């Protein structure tokens, strides 16, 4: 395993380890990997995860792209999945 950035949840006891190609989530009951997203239309190429942050009560993961702007995905802290369409970061 390579070095990762560590991010702790505000809502529960989840700890997120951010790697280039995945986010590994550790909670009291489960360890789960969230893989780097893939665009089924191949319009956008996602290169790597960068960091995580809160905006209000929502948790986001930022992904580097080959486009002009990186994208952010909302993270569902209950299902431990990326949800919704990606949002451009400017």
Model-derived features with residue positions:
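Repeated scaffold domains used in trafficking and secretory/extracellular systems
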Residues: 1-13, 38-56, 85-90
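Surface-exposed loop/turn elements that mediate protein-protein interactions on large endomembrane-trafficking
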Residues: 1-2, 22-42, 70-88
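Short beta-strand elements that form the blades of beta-propeller/WD-repeat-like
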Residues: 5-19, 24, 55-67
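Assembly/interface hotspot detector across virion components, adhesins/toxins, and nucleic-acid enzymes
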Residues: 16-18, 52, 73-75
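Acidic, low-complexity, intrinsically disordered interaction modules
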Residues: 29, 34, 42-71
């Amino acid at each position: 395993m390579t070095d990762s950035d560590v991010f702790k949840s505000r809502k529960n006891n989840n700890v997120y380890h951010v790697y280039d190609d995945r986010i590994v989530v550790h909670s009291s009951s489960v360890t789960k990997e969230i893989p780097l997203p893939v665009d089924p239309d191949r319009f956008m190429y996602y290169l790597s995860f960068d960091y995580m942050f809160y905006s209000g009560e929502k948790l986001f993961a930022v992904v580097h792209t080959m486009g002009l702007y990186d994208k952010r995905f909302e993270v569902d802290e209950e299902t431990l999945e990326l949800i919704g369409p990606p949002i451009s970061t400017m």
